[in-house]
Amino acid sequence: MTDEQLLERITLDAKVMTGKPVIKGTRLTVEYVLNLLAHGATPEEIIQEYDSLSQEDIRACILFAKKSLEDMTFMPLAVETV
């Protein structure tokens, strides 16, 4: 599956979850899925809990986050030592 095909699984609609990106056909936000992964859930566990999801949906969330970060500019923070 191409990146473009994966990203088609993510939609944004101001009327759904206040416009946050969601997996198409669900009310599951990309943010929520990434939070589950960040806290140790495996894709298989997420799919077991939300049986309408697929591996491709999980991959789409990760890819969406990656693409969102690609064009951002980050500024290093100055850290003072004591």
Question: Each predicted region: which residue ranges?
Answer:
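N-terminal first-folded block
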Residues: 1-27
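Long, charge-rich, low-complexity alpha-helical segments
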Residues: 29-82
